[in-house]
Regions:
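Nucleotide/phosphate-binding sheet-loop regions of phosphoryl- and nucleotidyl-transfer enzymes
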Residues: 182-184, 194, 252-281, 377-380
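A generic structural motif
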Residues: 231-235, 312-314, 573
């Protein structure tokens, strides 16, 4: 008889559910396998075939491991806090809770129709109080251990979403959520000191099985560099302008300095700067620009010389001008740089525009035409003259800096501390109380979760303040430390919070005493294999490794790294080879494929599209080919069983 996928799909999916066929066992004598996929954000659009490809690979691995006798944990959940849901709720006059529940129901229906072997008894939802209680608990632990701080600073701000964005969430000068232009705004920001874990995150990569491209992206994101901190005296003062450089060997070629327009020394010595009006105007222009706009390499170089303020090159003793320019940022390095125009393209362009001296210190190019950025013999460099090995010349300069007390070897990171707050409603409330007497005080652990109040108006204020700031019953409270009048923090956590530890909650999803039982953690950790998208191998993967390593350091988890192995599937493109998009009308709904060809056909096709790690276009013709293959397989099975099908 002909293979009837509708009958077969329902039959086996019902049997699996009735028998709890995919529930992880409590038998810890069996070898374990923890297979993890990135849990989805339950958007109103529902799942797309990209989700199916992401999950189908791990699905095959987990089914094989079960056949081999492993105790398999293959869970699923929903990363449900976040701005898209809130924006949709505002637009459609609904509550985010209602939107979230509706979307999760739809996602569950889709996932079950495809027949994935998830353990549904361990499903988590990051918006449930029983879950975000422990998200807040981990934040409190970080606060107690000095990894949380608050600072007023210029931030990336989305006027459309009315929310502060991290650098990671505003790449290209665009909001990662709504894609509108980002502006700079001064705000109080909560930060997590992820930079304190930079070396541990790098060292941890030596202990895990990550593909070379994923490891490289993580290393580049953290961006560890070794160089030197050097002090340049400001002429006529006792002040030192401290810079960081990875090329201390080129100090003889420094002919000017550049400071960030926000540098505090500008205001400190304003009375010495004769063109302060021009400086003030330029600073005002810079304040309107986003970080992306300020740091683009291809843009025209702009700046203003600080007339009346100059620096002394500590190696040559020569007086050199100080400029301010928008491409130098206070949040990077020290907020000032030394400029070696002969051997840096950006410095070269700047020097040419402003008529600044260019001194060649590395032989090999023609500096009358362009900067020379290669290696070569050191020239015009005093005690370094004749050196041809860059490493040797750097080491000799480091020795000299130390001997003279004008600098020292140092390390810097490209990664910055993690901006960790949003001025929106649909997120985890930050469990901090502000007391006039005691300062910032953590909400007591026994009072967690700090619940998100149920409100009717959850739109942010025009000034960008959180909707929670308008709820007096939430804001006004007593200080947990002194008992005096205090106010609760009204910002919420970013969407990245809940996804930074969800793999731990799967292990013991219903425990209300701890986020997971230590014995369960000991058995199941680390995750044996984690598969997800390449778009998450920096932010999410680094953030979750950071949270896990912190929990390891305070004795809450038994492993230093959360994931033993990581892989990434390629994107499923539209039939025209372009990324699937509603606006382009090339999105494929998995429900449509299941209706027409069956769940097995869909899962088979996404596994045979090509190299699993590469992008591939959708092909209806190939889907039909997979259906014919399964028809022949079913016919062969029937023939072997003697049912007469030929």
């Amino acid at each position: 008889m002909k293979y009837d996928f509708k009958v077969s799909d329902k039959k086996w999916q019902d049997i699996w559910e009735e028998q709890g066929a995919f529930h992880a066992s409590s038998d810890k004598t069996k070898p374990k396998f923890y297979g993890l996929v990135e849990f989805p954000y339950p958007s109103g659009a529902g799942m797309h075939v990209g989700h199916i490809k992401a999950y189908s690979g791990m699905e095959v691995i987990c089914r094989k491991k079960r056949m081999q006798g492993y105790n398999v944990l293959f869970p699923i959940g929903f990363d449900a806090f976040g701005l898209p849901t809130e924006n949709y709720a505002i637009k459609n006059n609904m509550h985010p809770r209602e939107v979230t529940d509706k979307n999760i129901t739809h996602f569950k229906q889709q996932l079950k129709r495809v027949g994935f072997s998830f353990d549904w008894t361990r499903t988590v939802d990051t918006t449930e109080e029983s879950y975000y209680k422990w998200t807040q608990w981990i934040f409190r632990k970080m606060f107690d251990h000095g990894l949380v701080f608050r600072d007023k600073t210029l931030v990336n701000y989305c006027p459309s979403c009315k929310v502060v964005l991290s650098n990671e969430d505003s790449q290209g000068g665009k909001c990662d959520i709504c894609h509108s232009d980002v502006v700079q705004k001064s705000k109080d920001v909560w930060y997590l000191r992820i930079t304190e874990y930079a070396d541990k995150l790098l060292e941890g990569l030596d202990t895990v099985d990550y593909p070379a491209n994923i490891r490289m992206q993580q290393e580049n994101w953290i961006g560890r560099s070794t160089g030197a901190f050097v002090n340049f005296s400001i002429s006529g003062t006792d002040e030192k302008l401290r810079i960081y450089t990875t090329r201390p060997d080129t100090l003889f070629g420094v002919t000017f300095m550049v400071m960030a327009p926000e540098h505090p020394l500008i205001d400190k010595y304003a009375d010495r700067i004769s063109n302060m009006d021009a400086v003030t105007d330029y600073r005002a222009e810079c304040a309107k620009k986003t970080e992306f706009e300020r740091t683009q390499l291809v843009k025209d170089k702009t700046g203003v010389c600080l007339n009346g303020l100059s620096a002394i090159n500590p190696i040559t003793g020569k007086e050199i001008p100080i400029y301010i320019s928008d491409y130098v940022m206070m949040g990077y390095g020290t907020g000032a740089i030394m400029a070696v125009p002969a051997h840096d393209e950006r410095d070269y362009d700047f020097a040419k525009k402003f008529g600044i001296d260019i001194v060649e210190v590395i032989k090999g190019g023609d500096i009358s035409k362009e900067a020379y950025t290669g290696d070569g013999e050191m020239i015009n460099s005093g005690f370094l003259n004749g050196f041809t090995n860059k490493k040797d010349s750097i080491e000799r300069m480091l020795e000299y800096l130390s001997e003279q007390g004008i600098g020292e070897k140092g390390v810097q990171y490209k990664m910055k501390d993690w901006a960790f707050n949003r001025q929106r409603y649909w997120g985890e409330p930050i469990p901090i109380v502000h007391c006039p007497k005691c300062g910032m005080v953590g909400v007591p652990y026994e009072e967690l979760p700090l619940r998100l109040p149920d409100v009717k108006n959850f739109e942010p204020g025009e000034g960008g303040e959180s909707p929670l700031a308008k709820i007096e019953s939430f804001v006004n409270c007593k200080c947990p430390k002194c008992g005096g009048d205090a106010k609760r923090e009204t910002d919420t956590m970013p969407q990245w919070a809940g996804s930074s530890w969800y793999f731990l909650r799967y292990i013991d999803a219903h425990n209300d005493k701890v986020f997971a039982d230590p014995e369960e953690l000991k058995y199941w950790l680390p995750v044996d294999w984690y598969n997800g998208g390449m778009e998450h191998v920096t932010r999410h993967l680094i953030y979750s490794r950071f949270w896990h390593r912190f929990l390891y350091d305070i004795g809450e988890v038994p492993t230093a790294e959360p994931y033993a192995k990581r892989s990434a599937q390629g994107m499923v493109l539209g039939a025209n080879g372009v990324k699937m998009s509603k606006s382009l009308g090339n999105v494929v709904d998995p429900n449509d494929v299941v209706d027409q060809y069956g769940a097995d056909t869909l899962r088979t096709y996404v596994l045979f599209m090509g190299d699993y790690g590469s992008a591939a276009p959708w092909s209806d013709t190939s889907v039909k080919g997979c259906r014919r293959f399964l028809d022949r397989t079913a016919a062969l099975t029937d023939m072997i069983k003697g049912t007469g099908v030929t």
